[in-house]
Amino acid sequence: MTKARIDARFAELAREGRAAFVPYVMAGDPDRETALAILKGLPAAGADIIELGFPFSDPMAEGPPIQRAAGRALAKGMTLQGVLDLVRAFRAGDATTPLILMGYMNPLVTWGLEAFARDASDAGVDGLIIVDCPPEEADPLADALDAAGVSLIRLATPTTGDARLKVVVRRTSGFVYYVSVAGVTGVKEADAAAVAPNVERVRKASGLPVAVGFGIKTPERAAQVAQVADAVVVGSALVDEVAEAVDMNEDVTARVLSKVESLAKAVRLARRSHEAV
């Protein structure tokens, strides 16, 4: 399946006239068993696509919430092999929900790009977002992923000009991830009115659906962004729920999935203001 799952999901949602809800969770946070329970519960809670972070010791694009989540996962022994094992366990019960890995280049280089692409595809990964791989250096990774049938999903930002955007989207497939605010994750809030023209610009340049992430923390904000984007990504707000549940000795899985349900409902009820892709 791989790439086909992403395309099929966006086609399905376009027919429904709504955006996808994409929760981001960190693999292995707060531990492997809980992370797997959360992962398995996401589709029923309303996730249309899942973004699974793999922990890295120097997550430069992340704000404090996701940095701490990576630290918790690493402290519990989560590895890149462990991440693929989680994906396999998830796929044993779900063959249709697209799953994207998000992380950094160094662990992939250590693994070997071609080998990792094959292993990720075999595990059931549909796409990959690598935060610190610029387009000028992306061809070896893009070639490996293409051969394995896995999408390389690239990032565009508010400061990505038109000429640069052409370079960014050249090897992109699946969708484009639009970073709605400058800076690291979990700090500022997205402004749907400001996001809208850039989302349309990215959509026209790429011919692909556009997901908007960074700065979306509440159902209200998610609904606003869902009116102009093809997908809404929420990450820091969910990893915050993990941290707070751990601190308060609450049921982590139940708390996270409850938050997902409220966000997913808001996205599902929001009607998109542009024609479906």
Curated annotation (Swiss-Prot):
It catalyses: (1S,2R)-1-C-(indol-3-yl)glycerol 3-phosphate + L-serine = D-glyceraldehyde 3-phosphate + L-tryptophan + H2O. Gene3D superfamilies: Aldolase class I. It comes from the Bacteria. The active site is at residues 51, 62. It holds the Pfam family Trp_syntA. Its EC number is 4.2.1.20. Keywords: Amino-acid biosynthesis, Aromatic amino acid biosynthesis, Lyase, Tryptophan biosynthesis. InterPro entries: Aldolase_TIM, RibuloseP-bd_barrel, Trp_synthase_alpha_AS, Trp_synthase_suA. GO terms for cellular component: cytosol. GO terms for molecular function: tryptophan synthase activity. Transmembrane segments: none annotated. It is an enzyme of class 4 (lyase). PANTHER family: TRYPTOPHAN SYNTHASE ALPHA CHAIN, CHLOROPLASTIC (PTHR43406:SF1), TRYPTOPHAN SYNTHASE, ALPHA CHAIN (PTHR43406). Belongs to the TrpA family. The alpha subunit is responsible for the aldol cleavage of indoleglycerol phosphate to indole and glyceraldehyde 3-phosphate. This is Tryptophan synthase alpha chain. The gene is trpA.
